[in-house]
Amino acid sequence: MRPGLPPYLTVFTVYLLSHLPSQRYGADAASEALDPHAFHLLLNTYGRPIRFLRENTTQCTYNSSLRNSTVVRENAISFNFFQSYNQYYVFHMPRCLFAGPLAEQFLNQVDLTETLERYQQRLNTYALVSKDLASYRSFSQQLKAQDSLGQQPTTVPPPIDLSIPHVWMPPQTTPHDWKGSHTTSGLHRPHFNQTCILFDGHDLLFSTVTPCLHQGFYLMDELRYVKITLTEDFFVVTVSIDDDTPMLLIFGHLPRVLFKAPYQRDNFILRQTEKHELLVLVKKAQLNRHSYLKDSDFLDAALDFNYLDLSALLRNSFHRYAVDVLKSGRCQMLDRRTVEMAFAYALALFAAARQEEAGTEISIPRALDRQAALLQIQEFMITCLSQTPPRTTLLLYPTAVDLAKRALWTPDQITDITSLVRLVYILSKQNQQHLIPQWALRQIADFALQLHKTHLASFLSAFARQELYLMGSLVHSMLVHTTERREIFIVETGLCSLAELSHFTQLLAHPHHEYLSDLYTPCSSSGRRDHSLERLTRLFPDATVPATVPAALSILSTMQPSTLETFPDLFCLPLGESFSALTVSEHVSYVVTNQYLIKGISYPVSTTVVGQSLIITQTDSQTKCELTRNMHTTHSITAALNISLENCAFCQSALLEYDDTQGVINIMYMHDSDDVLFALDPYNEVVVSSPRTHYLMLLKNGTVLEVTDVVVDATDSRLLMMSVYALSAIIGIYLLYRMLKTC
């Protein structure tokens, strides 16, 4: 290359000619002989020669300044490059190379006036894999779209001894605007609602125009974020840590990702699989912030298996990374853990869109479970990475919504309650809650009550945590069917006991968890906002706090909703303060605090030591929440000496255990008479006699009772009838015995 020739010119021309169809350059181009002595430089690109004519000319001066000129001929354009005073090197190039939108697009992205010094400086700006990272890896596993869970209706199967309710679908009229889908094809493919100009203005890449969608997760400010860009053939993970040029991870089928001279794709391939490549574009000056790129095991958990198996990908990759991020308290940080999690999330979206390539039929329950799993990891990404309030654009899945609509209004499409939970979850997360009927939420609330009863005297199973995770999200993402949502909310609150919190901290000590739901506790979605390390230390002053307790409280802080705005009578509660909110019935709520916090009818607790206070405020579910720090209407707490189960007057109530000096210890929800009997049965040791411990019952009618010394009167009509039936059966058996003996 002659001195003074911009480096882009030759390479760019080679690129253009290799991408343009072979054609004549001028009327007599086909008859011209190729004389090598007639050209200053001859390049041959795949049989298509580029000819640079040798010609020296002089240029007249004008106003004592030199100018180079471009001579336009019929079939060529000449470029004049200064060599010495009054002497230029002139290169003639075919005009067709510079005509049309493709040429214009590329010419607008290169600087033909770039100096050699700037060119050399740019060569040393970006990190090369072979030179600066030295961590290239290839994976040879076979890639095939499939689902390792087969037709399994739930990711975590239920215990064999748990009876799963069947869905009862009432007679109903199909909505007039219903257009349900009858296919699962393209079910997990999000709607590409944008046309993107990718890599526009990037130093290394030519821009490309393609259908795409963007998702941004902004942390503390505009300069700290992770962005996901998904296209048909590849995805891009953009990571910015206060940088003017963010790091790019580009993965997929990449023939449309084109590099500017002098760089080549091979310089930036960090990982390679059977079908896809991973490119990393990062400046050398930023390697100290992204030092994990040099780790030989970076992204192994995402790529070292058949990642086109969506279920395996979610379990082995995303959930593995997400569990690590959550347990280590790395949400709202940008390091190796969160970058790997973001990559696994993008890979899950990429793989999910290709599930129809498996070519196998998929059942409706399995399809709903997979789609709910995709929306659930999106929800976690927003919870973990986005600032408050979140600004992330939600991905839309129109085919999944159509399928859910069909299943909801067509008999026998879904049979188990677990599928209904996922169907409702999908509609709620796709802003379609107006399509959710009341009967669906009613059955989900009944399922929550079943889990409540199943685990009154036992720890939550992995299956129960999975289902409560989904239901807890429903509670805080919908505005309709408030009665049913209030019931689910109080169930989650009642399950958030000290025993659950203790068991949860023990779970965190285990090194392996397959799914995020394994780390879910009802405390995350409940009305209990009074758990803190300081409070636990006060409750157990002589106990050594396990190392997992801070991690457990960090998880609670991360996973708890940032607002209670879906409940009109609770939305104003300041979530930074300590309180417990109890939606015991359709119309009555209680807020338990150590100071006046919300307007309503308050019941100050008098049996606490000096310096400690406990205030129970009753509110009406239809009354708008109003924050107040002043004393207002108060009622006294009545001591109850006995409780009658007649007419279930004590159903839908909360049993509150508190200590004279430490305040609230436990809260238990009692939905029906069986729960009341269980709580007050001395053999269950729920109510334990102690000089410092007291028990209050918060009733559905707005009354608060002291029940520390209560005696249960179980002689209600229902129990009497059961006794009569039992006595009659005994007498009948005895008479039958006498008759047989006589014979």
Swiss-Prot record:
Name of the encoding gene: gH
Subcellular location per the Swiss-Prot or TrEMBL entry: Virion membrane; Host cell membrane; Host endosome membrane
Q: Which residues are modified by glycosylation?
A: 56, 63, 68, 193, 642, 701
| Keywords, comma-separated and alphabetical | Fusion of virus membrane with host cell membrane, Fusion of virus membrane with host membrane, Glycoprotein, Host cell membrane, Host endosome, Host membrane, Host-virus interaction, Membrane, Sialic acid, Signal, Transmembrane, Transmembrane helix, Viral attachment to host cell, Viral attachment to host entry receptor, Viral envelope protein, Viral penetration into host cytoplasm, Virion, Virus entry into host cell
Show the InterPro entries listed in the entry.
Answer: Herpes_gH (IPR003493), Herpes_glycoH_C (IPR035305), Herpes_glycoH_C_sf (IPR038172)
Give the protein's recorded name.
Answer: Envelope glycoprotein H
Biological role stated in the UniProt entry: The heterodimer glycoprotein H-glycoprotein L is required for the fusion of viral and plasma membranes leading to virus entry into the host cell. Following initial binding to host receptor, membrane fusion is mediated by the fusion machinery composed of gB and the heterodimer gH/gL. May also be involved in the fusion between the virion envelope and the outer nuclear membrane during virion morphogenesis. In human cytomegalovirus, forms two distincts complexes to mediate viral entry, a trimer and a pentamer at the surface of the virion envelope.
* Free-text description of this protein's post-translational modifications in UniProt: N-glycosylated, O-glycosylated, and sialylated.
The chain's Intravirion topological domains, given as residue ranges, are 742-743
On assembly, the entry states: Interacts with glycoprotein L (gL); this interaction is necessary for the correct processing and cell surface expression of gH. The heterodimer gH/gL seems to interact with gB trimers during fusion. Forms the envelope pentamer complex (PC) composed of gH, gL, UL128, UL130, and UL131A. The pentamer interacts with host NRP2. Forms the envelope trimer complex composed of gH, gL, and gO. The trimer interacts with host PDGFRA. The trimer also interacts with host EPHA2. Interacts with UL116.
Q: Which family does it belong to?
A: Belongs to the herpesviridae glycoprotein H family.
Q: Which residues are exposed on the Virion surface face of the membrane?
A: 24-720
Task: Tell me what topology the record assigns in the membrane.
Answer: Single-pass type I membrane protein
Q: Which residues form the signal peptide?
A: 1-23
One GO-annotated biological process of the protein: entry receptor-mediated virion attachment to host cell
Q: Which organism is it from?
A: Human cytomegalovirus (strain AD169) (HHV-5)
Which intervals of the chain are annotated as region Interaction with gL? 218-281
Q: Does the keyword Calcium apply?
A: no
Query: Among the entry's GO cellular component annotations, what is one?
Result: viral envelope
Indicate the transmembrane segments per the record: 721-741
